[in-house]
């Protein structure tokens, strides 16, 4: 009985695809669309922001991945934290994160954003932005190259494609 169901399903798939129809699951389509249309919001705090600008320029062209930088957190679904996060800036980071639309992702770029970096033992530095907001992808380096940032974004796209449909972690 189970094999009959799969044989009928394969027969239906082959008949419809030969006629120009595309069969897919809605969960796969939604996760594909989310992964290929990320709208990052920059939160550039130090020199890593320069590398982020370079990655968005014409040589690397992040637009080809469907990424469009947005100035407002209400229009973006990805926050790229680039640079040293101080104790004074931490509440602003959390406020901006809370204003982002669901589902939302965070990419931590550079040693300072990942763990405090060179200023790790300073009294005024947060030792990693993951203490303030949940981070999905870490990009190491001081500062990380534009290629490293693009690789991190591609890893985030893979992570998003593994999620299913309407389910997301509201954190």
UniProtKB/Swiss-Prot annotation:
GO terms for biological process: aerobic respiration; electron transport coupled proton transport. It is a peripheral membrane protein. It catalyses: a quinone + NADH + 5 H(+)(in) = a quinol + NAD(+) + 4 H(+)(out). GO terms for molecular function: 4 iron, 4 sulfur cluster binding; iron ion binding; NADH dehydrogenase (ubiquinone) activity; NADH:ubiquinone reductase (non-electrogenic) activity; quinone binding. [4Fe-4S] cluster binds at residues 47-48, 112, 142. Its cofactor is [4Fe-4S] cluster. It is found in: Cell inner membrane. GO terms for cellular component: plasma membrane; respiratory chain complex I. Keywords: 4Fe-4S, Cell inner membrane, Cell membrane, Iron, Iron-sulfur, Membrane, Metal-binding, NAD, Quinone, Translocase, Transport, Ubiquinone. Its EC number is 7.1.1.-. It holds the Pfam family Oxidored_q6. NDH-1 shuttles electrons from NADH, via FMN and iron-sulfur (Fe-S) centers, to quinones in the respiratory chain. Couples the redox reaction to proton translocation (for every two electrons transferred, four hydrogen ions are translocated across the cytoplasmic membrane), and thus conserves the redox energy in a proton gradient. NDH-1 is composed of 14 different subunits. Subunits NuoB, C, D, E, F, and G constitute the peripheral sector of the complex. This is NADH-quinone oxidoreductase subunit B. It comes from Rickettsia typhi (strain ATCC VR-144 / Wilmington).
């Amino acid at each position: 009985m189970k094999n009959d169901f799969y044989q009928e399903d394969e027969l239906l798939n082959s008949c419809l695809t030969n006629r120009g129809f595309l069969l897919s699951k809605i969960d796969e389509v939604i996760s594909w669309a989310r992964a290929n249309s990320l709208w990052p919001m920059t939160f550039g705090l130090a020199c890593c922001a320069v590398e982020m600008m370079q990655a968005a320029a014409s040589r690397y062209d992040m637009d080809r991945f469907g990424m469009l930088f947005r100035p407002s957190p209400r229009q973006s679904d990805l926050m790229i934290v680039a640079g040293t996060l101080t104790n004074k800036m931490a509440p602003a980071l959390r406020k901006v994160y809370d204003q982002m639309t669901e589902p939302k992702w965070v990419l931590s770029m550079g040693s300072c954003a990942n763990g405090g970096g060179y200023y790790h033992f300073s009294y005024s530095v947060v030792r990693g932005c993951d203490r303030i907001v949940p981070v999905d992808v870490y990009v190491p380096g001081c500062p990380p190259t534009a290629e490293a940032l693009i690789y991190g974004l591609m890893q985030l796209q893979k992570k998003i494609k593994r999620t299913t449909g309407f389910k997301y972690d509201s954190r």
